[in-house]
Every structure is written in structure tokens, then in C-alpha cells.
């Protein structure tokens, strides 16, 4: 006797989250808030592919970075080409700017993007192997006022979400005239330490990366390492002082962290990160900086740029720790409850009229009965329920029930759209 096995039940891969209602509304709210903050500052949207030539990220992000050496999802396509799911957004934006000649139009080219990125990391709270990033890039002008604009934009985004427990850390990573001397000093210091072989090798390739090492023993050994802020050129120092001065004028609070090292190798001059201490060791919720040599490194003109990226999941986790919620405004406002066959035929017309007037409306399907339909209205998050039965049809009225206050009012059928719109706008 043969037995049939149940079909396999699929689940999302490890570290790859789903966002379903109601959480998807908060997810969209973070993205839309950032997009609004960017567009009012003159940033234009750009849509990019989620995979690119692997060498774009190797050259753009930095071959010695952990992102490139340990975390990228790389595959060979059927044409034998090495492709990589994007681990961050900036390199792809720069490639698009070069390819489509945006660097030869009005500068700075100010762009805003959003979409998934991929890194093979150990999944933990707010950090996933697929994560959503929103960001801005301002390309083509070396102006400290632009650095300050990007930082202030990010700050406004977090405050617009209602976050309060975050802080801004800021530093300068110098420029091409002062970094070589600092690099020599730092390498000499690191060579004198009893570091393991892999870390010593990293110190020779990119000594700044050692300062980003999270291991307690390495952090202790490098506590007295020379700091980039002590080696800034006059130009880099003036740039940094102008940035901080404008932030002071804009009332954007910050602390200077001379030991800050971002996880990507392309940053120069201004470098910043927003952190939320309630998130523990992995406290970053967004960051960015200036990258003056990146476009030339990717085959374009030698133009500067500055940008910022926000991790949507990190922002959601910060909101959760502060016990705050946000919404994207897409929940249903009005829910139709029809009792009886004729009412069920009439309700779609009413719901359609509401939708055409701009009201977010839905109705109960499947003849659930009054109790089940009212529960569905509550679950949908509706403010008002419209109830129609045989008696209401006979009188050409609709019962409008306020689900927040519990009040119910009879409204003429031909006035229901006007009545509901008025109550929603009150």
C-alpha cells in the first residue's frame, strides 16, 4: 500500500526576513520618510540592478575590506562572468552616473536610492543577510556644505521617524596629501604590536582596517594608536572645521570620534555614523562620508562625492527599543459590512465611490455575518465601518460606525462619501 508524503513546506532562507502586515507598514514608513527628506532637498530617484560585475565592488568597496573578502554573494553566470549581489549601494550609483553621463550634466548630481543589499554575515537582531538600504549620493562638487547637507538630511530623517536615543559621531579621514604620512606612522605602530599573522598582513594592506577590529584584545593593543585627526593637512582640517561649523549653525548635535573607521575603504575627509546605544555592540543605524577618489577608481572623471546610507532594519530595531511605531498611511480607513444578498451587491459600488474620492476602503467578503465582519474591520485598522442591511436599503441609508469612539450614525446613501471624507479630515 503506497503512502503519499505531504508536500514540503518552504520557509525563507536563514537571515532573509519577510515583511508582512502589519510590520510591512512600518517598513514602508521608514523608506518613505527617508525618500521624502531626500526629495525636498533636491535628490532625484535612481533604480539600480541588484547584481553587478564583481570587480565593481572589489575596486569600489576595497579589496581588503571584510565586505569583499568575507561577505559578498558571488556567482558565475551562464556566460562565465563573475557577478555579485550588491553588498552596498554607493558603487552601483557611481557606475550608473559614469555610464549614463550624469557627471557631465548639472553638478552636483543628487540621487536617492532604495533596495535590498546582501552580505553573508551571522544573522542577529536588526542585521540580516538580505537587508534593505536607503541612501543618498551627491556627486561632482567638493564642498563641505554638501557634507553638512547630507548629514543634516540623515539627522532630520531619524528625528522625523520619532527617534530620540541616537547620536551622531563624526571624524575626518584626511586626504591624499596627509594620509600617506599617517599610514606610515600607523603601520610602524602596528608592526610593533604582537598581532596575529592575519592582522599583521591586514596592517600592511590597509592599516586603518586594524583599527576597525572588534576583538577586545586587538582594541586594547591599539588603544594608543596614532590618530588621523592629528595628521590632517591644512586643507582637510579646514574642510572638517567648515563641516562642523555648519552643523553647529543647523543645530545638529554631534561628537567627534577620532577612532572611527567605516567598514568601506573608499571614504576620505568627512566620515560619520549614527549610533543608538540601546542596540548593544552593533549600535550603528546609518552612516556615510565623502569619497573623493571613488569615481576615478571606477573609470570615470576625477570628481568628488558624499553620501549616506540607512539600514531600514536597524532603524526599525531602534524604534522598537524606544517603543515607538510608525505607519506608512496605507491602512484601510473605511470598511464595508453588508448583511444580505442585495446589500452585498450594493456595497462594492459604495466602496468604489469612496476609493475614487481618495479614501482607502475595503469590504467584507464571503458573507461572514455581522460579528465576523466587524472583527475584520478592526483587524484591518479601519476608522469607520459602513453597515448596510435590508432595513438600511429600504430607507436608502448607511449606518456609519466610528470604531474608535463606538458611535453610530445613520447617513443618507447619496451623502455617505461626503460624510466619510468630512469625518476623516476633521
From Swiss-Prot:
Location(s), subcellular: Cytoplasm
A Pfam family reported for this protein in Swiss-Prot or TrEMBL: HGTP_anticodon
This protein's GO CC annotations: cytoplasm
Main location: cytoplasm
Tagged with keyword Protein biosynthesis: yes
Catalysis: reaction(s): tRNA(His) + L-histidine + ATP = L-histidyl-tRNA(His) + AMP + diphosphate + H(+)
A GO BP entry: histidyl-tRNA aminoacylation
Protein EC: 6.1.1.21
GO molecular-function term, one example from the UniProt record: histidine-tRNA ligase activity
UniProt keywords, alphabetically: Aminoacyl-tRNA synthetase, ATP-binding, Cytoplasm, Ligase, Nucleotide-binding, Protein biosynthesis
Record-linked InterPro entries: aa-tRNA-synth_II, aa-tRNA-synth_II/BPL/LPL, Anticodon-bd, Anticodon-bd_dom_sf, His-tRNA-ligase, HisRS-like_core, HisRS/HisZ, HisRS_anticodon
Taxonomic superkingdom: Bacteria
Alphabetical list of PROSITE patterns matching this protein: AA_TRNA_LIGASE_II (PS50862)
Subunit-level organization: Homodimer.
Family: Belongs to the class-II aminoacyl-tRNA synthetase family.
HAMAP family the record matches: His_tRNA_synth
PANTHER family reported in the protein's UniProt record: HISTIDINE--TRNA LIGASE, MITOCHONDRIAL-RELATED, HISTIDYL-TRNA SYNTHETASE
NCBIfam families: hisS
Protein name in UniProt: Histidine--tRNA ligase
Organism: Corynebacterium kroppenstedtii (strain DSM 44385 / JCM 11950 / CIP 105744 / CCUG 35717)
Amino acid at each position: 500500500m503506497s503512502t503519499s508524503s505531504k508536500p514540503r513546506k518552504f520557509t525563507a532562507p536563514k537571515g532573509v526576513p519577510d515583511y508582512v502586515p502589519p510590520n510591512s507598514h512600518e517598513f514602508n514608513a521608514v523608506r518613505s520618510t527617508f525618500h521624502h527628506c531626500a526629495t525636498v532637498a533636491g535628490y532625484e530617484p535612481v533604480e539600480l540592478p541588484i547584481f553587478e560585475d564583481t570587480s565593481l565592488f572589489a575596486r569600489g568597496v576595497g579589496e581588503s575590506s571584510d565586505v569583499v573578502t568575507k561577505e559578498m554573494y558571488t556567482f558565475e553566470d551562464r556566460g562565465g562572468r563573475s557577478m555579485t549581489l550588491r553588498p552596498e549601494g554607493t558603487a552601483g550609483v557611481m557606475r550608473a552616473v559614469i555610464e549614463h553621463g550624469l557627471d557631465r550634466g548639472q553638478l552636483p548630481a543628487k540621487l536617492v536610492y532604495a533596495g535590498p543589499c546582501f552580505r553573508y554575515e551571522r544573522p542577529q537582531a536588526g542585521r540580516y543577510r538580505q537587508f534593505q538600504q536607503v541612501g543618498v549620493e551627491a556627486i561632482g562638487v567638493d564642498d563641505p556644505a554638501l557634507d553638512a547637507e547630507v548629514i543634516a538630511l540623515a539627522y532630520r530623517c531619524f528625528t522625523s521617524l520619532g527617534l530620540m536615543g541616537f547620536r551622531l559621531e563624526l571624524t575626518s579621514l584626511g586626504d591624499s596629501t596627509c594620509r600617506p604620512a599617517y599610514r606610515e606612522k600607523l603601520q610602524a605602530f602596528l608592526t610593533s604590536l604582537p598581532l596575529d599573522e592575519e592582522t599583521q598582513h591586514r596592517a600592511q594592506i590597509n592599516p586603518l582596517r586594524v583599527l576597525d577590529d572588534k576583538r577586545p584584545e586587538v582594541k586594547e593593543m591599539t588603544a594608543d594608536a596614532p590618530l588621523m585627526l592629528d595628521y590632517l593637512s591644512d586643507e582637510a582640517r579646514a574642510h572638517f572645521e567648515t563641516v562642523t561649523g555648519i552643523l553647529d549653525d543647523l543645530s545638529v548635535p554631534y561628537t567627534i570620534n577620532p577612532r572611527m573607521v567605516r567598514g568601506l575603504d573608499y571614504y576620505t575627509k568627512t566620515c560619520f555614523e549614527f549610533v543608538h546605544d540601546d542596540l548593544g555592540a552593533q549600535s550603528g543605524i546609518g552612516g556615510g562620508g565623502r569619497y573623493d577618489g571613488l569615481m576615478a577608481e571606477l573609470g570615470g572623471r576625477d570628481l568628488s562625492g558624499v553620501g549616506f546610507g540607512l539600514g531600514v532594519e536597524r532603524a526599525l530595531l531602534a524604534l522598537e527599543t524606544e517603543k515607538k511605531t510608525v505607519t506608512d498611511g496605507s491602512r484601510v480607513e473605511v470598511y464595508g459590512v453588508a448583511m444580505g444578498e442585495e446589500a452585498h451587491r450594493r456595497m462594492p459600488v459604495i466602496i468604489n465611490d469612496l476609493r475614487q474620492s481618495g479614501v482607502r476602503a475595503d469590504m467584507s467578503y464571503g458573507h461572514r455575518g455581522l460579528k465576523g465582519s466587524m472583527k475584520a474591520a478592526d483587524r484591518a485598522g479601519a476608522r469607520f465601518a459602513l453597515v448596510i442591511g435590508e432595513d438600511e436599503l429600504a430607507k436608502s441609508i448607511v449606518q456609519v460606525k466610528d470604531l474608535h469612539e463606538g458611535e453610530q450614525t445613520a447617513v443618507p446613501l447619496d451623502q455617505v462619501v461626503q460624510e466619510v471624507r468630512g469625518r476623516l479630515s476633521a
